[in-house]
């Protein structure tokens, strides 16, 4: 069984369906409310576990009900949560999504995801160094991603970086990642002076 460590975001998605978006100062009635598990990191962990991998999740949650919901969901999917840190006086990351008029508007609150730092990675290193693959995304601080990529490269641990959401990453350490999975928009952000064809070559 492949051992995968996912280092990344844990969110709850709060989705409101409405006929239109409210104007500034306006209150309107919505149609439906959905609360779902999210975060690119946690989503990757659940997907990998459901495909049969042995998965460990590394990240941060707040000391709140949403954090507990995330922990429960990960455990229900047989994911190791030993290296998820509960951060006092911090909210769990959330995405507030309005679906209206055929489109969506999203406000993301990083919350505890912003607390995923080098110490969180170091605490989980015993699991990371034994992994067949480490998966990372851009929903945690960029300096932490750089630290993960550099340290894993030095230890010959394979890293898959999903550079979403798009960000300006330093090519010097970006090239140390074993795999990068950008879409076309993210590829342009990573290599702004090259065409897609030039980058792939």
Annotated model-derived regions:
Residues 1-60, 65-69, 75-79:
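Glycine-rich phosphate/adenosyl-contacting loop at the front of the ribokinase-like
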């Amino acid at each position: 069984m492949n051992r995968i460590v996912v280092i990344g975001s844990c969110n709850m998605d709060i989705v409101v369906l409405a006929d239109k978006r409210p104007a500034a100062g306006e209150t309107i009635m919505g149609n439906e409310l959905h609360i779902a598990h999210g975060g690119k990191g946690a989503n990757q962990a659940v997907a990998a576990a459901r495909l049969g991998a042995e998965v460990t999740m590394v990240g941060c949650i707040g000391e709140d009900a949403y954090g507990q919901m995330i922990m429960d969901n990960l455990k229900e999917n047989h994911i190791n949560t030993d290296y998820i840190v509960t951060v006092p006086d911090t909210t769990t990351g959330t995405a507030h999504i309005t679906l209206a008029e055929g489109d969506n508007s999203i406000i993301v609150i990083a919350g505890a995801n912003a607390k995923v730092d080098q110490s969180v990675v170091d605490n989980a290193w015993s699991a990371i160094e034994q992994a067949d693959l480490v998966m990372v995304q851009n929903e945690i601080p960029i300096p932490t991603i750089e630290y993960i990529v550099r340290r894993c490269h030095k230890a010959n641990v394979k890293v898959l970086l999903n550079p979403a959401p798009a960000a300006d990453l330093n090519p010097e350490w970006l090239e140390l990642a074993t795999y990068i999975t950008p879409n076309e928009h993210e590829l342009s952000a990573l290599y702004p002076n090259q065409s897609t064809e030039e980058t792939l070559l």
